[in-house]
Swiss-Prot record:
Keywords: Cell membrane, Lipoprotein, Membrane, Palmitate, Signal. This is UPF0323 lipoprotein jhp_0217. A lipid is attached at residue 28 (N-palmitoyl cysteine). Residues 1-27 form the signal peptide. The lineage of its organism: Bacteria, Pseudomonadati, Campylobacterota, Epsilonproteobacteria, Campylobacterales.
Length: 215
């Protein structure tokens, strides 16, 4: 019986609640090892969900610091003091709806020009950070067409990540899980973010919680 390659030590860079969530993900994958069909296609986890850590910045904006494919969608928010909590399904849907309204009226920072290229004073709120991440491509797939062909979104999506290294780790993680670039559209997107026509049209299961922990 094959064992999952991702060990808990792989996630040493994520702390507190995010590490506990990863333990549950690894446990679920261990049980799934007895099902060859499920184990044979890691792309299923990409389609089902993503584990995302959003970190609050000094200007009260948020950045993606880590994200991985997972069987369920988990969005962990880490504040300036290092406290973490998992957003509930209701919170996530509310944030996405609010951001969709901003996209429609052109006030979302995801669709605005990046003047000067400076992050100072132009950070992303929770809603835009979620939609700029892989989780947003899944949870907000029904509004993907409003963003995918927008050149400003294509430039801004990468800016939702804390660093180029964080963005590249995410790209590598999801492209390794995809069976091919043509079927999942992950490896070929480059700086275009994660939205694509191959994404599912309904939201996957979301694991949520509200307790705060210290990182």
């Amino acid at each position: 019986m094959k064992k999952p390659y991702r060990k808990i030590s792989d996630y040493a860079i994520v702390g507190g609640l995010s590490a506990l969530v990863m333990v549950s993900i690894v446990g679920c994958k261990s049980n799934a090892d007895d099902k060859p069909k499920e184990q044979s296609s890691l792309s299923q986890s990409v389609q089902k969900g993503a584990f995302v850590i959003l970190e609050e910045q000094k200007d009260k904006s948020y950045k993606v610091v880590e994200e991985y494919p997972s069987s369920r969608t988990h969005i962990v928010v880490r504040d300036l003091q290092g406290n973490e909590r998992v957003l509930s399904n209701e919170e996530i849907q509310k944030l996405i709806k609010e951001e969709e309204a901003k996209i429609d009226n052109g006030t979302s920072k995801l669709v605005q020009p990046n003047n000067g290229g400076s992050n100072e004073g132009s950070g992303f709120g929770l809603g835009s950070a979620i939609l700029g991440s892989a989780a947003g491509a899944i949870l907000g797939s029904y509004i993907g067409n409003k963003l995918f062909n927008n050149p400003n979104y294509q430039q801004n999506a990468q800016r939702t990540y804390k660093s180029p290294q964080a963005y590249q780790r995410s790209q590598n993680s999801f492209s390794k899980s995809a069976p091919s670039a043509s079927s999942m559209g992950t490896a070929s997107k480059g700086q275009s973010g994660f939205f694509g026509s191959s994404r599912p049209t309904s939201s996957p299961a979301i694991s949520s919680g509200t307790r705060g922990f210290n990182a």
